[in-house]
Amino acid sequence: MPNTNDTQPTNERTRAQVTTARTVAEAARKTGEKVQSRIIIVENLADTSLVIDQAGDPNTVVEPSAEALSAAALSPIMQRLAALEATPTPAATVAEQVQASARLNRLADHAGITTRAIGIGWEDTSNAARRNWSEIARAAVTRGYNTIDLAAGRPEWTLFQWPAHPEWVSLEPQENPLRDVIATLRANGIEKIYLTLDMMVSTSLAKFPEWKAISRDGTIRNMPSPAALTRSPIRDMLAGAVAQVAAQFGDIIDGIIITELFWDSGSFSDNDLLLYRSDTGAPDWPRSEDGALQETPEYREWLTTKMADFIAHCRSLTAGVPLVMDVRVNWNQPLAGRPDSGHDYAKLLRVADEIQPWVYYDTGEESKAIALVYALNKQWPGRVRPALGLWSATPASVGKALAGLATAHRVQVTPYSKMGTLLR
């Protein structure tokens, strides 16, 4: 049914869609070229005394095989999900790319290369002209930071030009502040730059409420549902933004970070149910004897697969630019991830280059944060980039955590606006 609330002329919308499609197609074409160059870099760095891809190495990217699992040990729904995961998709190429990236990270670790990153939020990047980026870079380098992560906005209000969707751009037509900021940061000693893309699309979800996630308790969330990640317009909007960032900045950045993409106690919308039925063959959601919705292992397997499938799609559009996925943490069982949020770490690491766990702890709980980071690093060496948050922890507390993580190869501190004494 046509959306009668949309005032954009059909021909303009069609032209915009064609432009977006061309951007996506160009990103896909470049993927093959860029991944080959990255693989060559890895091969040139290879140390013959270092064995990376040993059998059983947790860092090796291996797609699950339905044949390798005993059919008798799986329920019919799990058998169908396993077959769905094993179906050839563009993710096969993505898996090859992230495996090459993982090997490069392990080689960097072996060489003693570390990443100490600062997350700079929208509050600063949206006011780029009012910030002294040379001074920001010099202060960061002086305190041992070598990487800056810059907020690039959300698909609905971007800090980058998007010709297909000028209505979503928060800039004047000739402005390109992020490119200027990146040049200044690099000129003043910052070695690596990442752009962070927030996946919240509140305005679009208000326009298309049928694509909102609905938690197990019935709460309607301002987040895209699993089904929304498989269908237009939400899927195209989110993935299109990733493709646009890669196309516009891929030559000058080291990666793209996807943030704010998760669910709370799953998602059980009507559109989700249609998708669940199609994927699993089940007639309804899992329920208890009294009819209450349940997050069974089969359900969480489905939920996390939908998230990983979407991230694989995004990664396939980056033209070889590494993709980092922000994830929630499980304090009680760190390696279990957060399947209720759609975050199965092992699945995500088949299609994303790294995960960035939100290690947002309270002051006084530094040891808990340190233990979690080392547990994740041990399981997935070279693939974990923890973010220490300053929302509930003081700069002094995060300083203690950083000292305890001295041997960790990758750590981010966020946000810059709250770092205070950490930069003095």
Give the residues covered by each predicted segment:
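Substrate-binding cleft of secreted/luminal carbohydrate-active enzymes
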Residues: 351-370, 380-424
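Glycine-rich, aromatic-flanked loop segments that form ligand/cofactor-binding clefts
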Residues: 149, 177-219, 256-264
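Aromatic-lined carbohydrate-recognition surfaces of secreted/lumenal glycan-active proteins
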Residues: 194-198, 255-264, 293-340, 382-393
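Catalytic domains of carbohydrate-active enzymes, especially glycoside hydrolases
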Residues: 131-157, 251-255, 348-354, 405-411
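Aromatic- and acidic-residue-enriched carbohydrate-binding clefts of CAZyme catalytic domains
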Residues: 155-178, 204-229, 268-301
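Substrate-binding cleft/loops of secretory-pathway carbohydrate-active enzymes
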Residues: 266, 323-364
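Active-site-adjacent "subsite" loops/lids of carbohydrate-active enzymes
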Residues: 114-127, 194-247
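Aromatic-lined substrate-binding rim segments of carbohydrate-active enzymes
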Residues: 136-137, 154-203, 298-318
